[in-house]
Amino acid sequence: MAKLTVKDVDLKGKKVLVRVDFNVPLKDGVITNDNRITAALPTIKYIIEQGGRAILFSHLGRVKEESDKAGKSLAPVAADLAAKLGQDVVFPGVTRGAELEAAINALEDGQVLLVENTRYEDVDGKKESKNDPELGKYWASLGDGIFVNDAFGTAHRAHASNVGISANVEKAVAGFLLENEIAYIQEAVETPERPFVAILGGSKVSDKIGVIENLLEKADKVLIGGGMTYTFYKAQGIEIGNSLVEEDKLDVAKALLEKANGKLILPVDSKEANAFAGYTEVRDTEGEAVSEGFLGLDIGPKSIAKFDEALTGAKTVVWNGPMGVFENPDFQAGTIGVMDAIVKQPGVKSIIGGGDSAAAAINLGRADKFSWISTGGGASMELLEGKVLPGLAALTEK
């Protein structure tokens, strides 16, 4: 990586500002999935082991008005992090002011402090989300000139807590998680071991146009599944029943198919139902066409076999988006089949691009079989699209 990393700077005795991604799901104040906290531990532990004083910044959900703050405090995260680290985490419960400054100045080497939800600053003029220059400068002033960005999940955003701080410190460096994310995803796309197969699912073509275009140039094959299948079908005049379709993207789908030169591989059958919810009939289609009064909710067994064949011998696989409505056991087979086809390839480098695909791998017990599961849905999508991520661009060059 051409940017400085946390290992390139002297941390001892320094107040080190760290952007982490602790945007975890909460239910009644209880964390329901702590993966993002666990993912940040190597960087935090390294800083405190080196004698640094870690000052952590993160957002949690969206905070638009004062009343939103109550359920969006990072207090439960501070408690969870303290348990994971086996030491106290100082939590002043504010984003600025004398109380925060006093707590930071009282830190000793090896201690950790968590600033309250950065998006509390969005209540008054969206200062965090709009990268208010004064806020970035203020937060930067709380440290000793070193900023570590370890929040890949927000690297595609230019916020005060990443780009704003970076602009006002001597050295802005990557943490271990950010470094790994970039290494796995960018290298897979830019310098893959071949054959390189990309698998794209999800419901909308509109979300993936840029990704499909970029991967058609980089990959040897691009497999398409999920709800967007039916926009590609309709673009070719195939009957889709009541399946999801983006009517305004039919021309785009047609153009992508023409541009693909056979690289774009579509399902050859579906699992169809007579309703999305409360259905009374589920069956496999004979071929591509979906029956009148039915809608396709997963790829079918012939498609699973076809995709299995397309993945045979693959050395690099990037997967983003499920093959069907995997949350429902009736429509999981496609996603499971594709996951199993990926991980059985000998010596394959297999990468999941965050979001629903990551949830599917975790929920369906396949997570440990993949080389890398990204922590950032939107950020990994933009990386797959070949875009420059603002949070990464703002870091100091080696």
From Swiss-Prot:
Chain sites annotated for binding substrate: D21, F22, N23, R36, H59, L60, G61, R62, R119, R157
Chief location of this protein within or outside the cell: cytoplasm
Membrane-spanning intervals of the chain: none
Pathway: Carbohydrate degradation; glycolysis; pyruvate from D-glyceraldehyde 3-phosphate: step 2/5
Molecular-function annotations in GO: ADP binding; angiostatin binding; ATP binding; phosphoglycerate kinase activity; protease binding
GO process terms (BP): gluconeogenesis; glycolytic process; positive regulation of fibrinolysis; positive regulation of plasminogen activation
Superkingdom assignment: Bacteria
EC number: 2.7.2.3
GO CC entries: cell surface; cytosol; peptidoglycan-based cell wall
Keywords associated with the record: ATP-binding, Cytoplasm, Glycolysis, Kinase, Nucleotide-binding, Transferase
Annotated ATP binding sites: K208, G296, E327, G354, G355, D356, S357
Database matches in SUPFAM superfamilies: Phosphoglycerate kinase
Catalysed reaction equations from the record: (2R)-3-phosphoglycerate + ATP = (2R)-3-phospho-glyceroyl phosphate + ADP
Localization: Cytoplasm
HAMAP family for the chain: Phosphoglyc_kinase
Sequence similarity: Belongs to the phosphoglycerate kinase family.
Subunit (UniProt): Monomer.
Protein name per Swiss-Prot or TrEMBL: Phosphoglycerate kinase
Source species: Streptococcus pneumoniae serotype 2 (strain D39 / NCTC 7466)
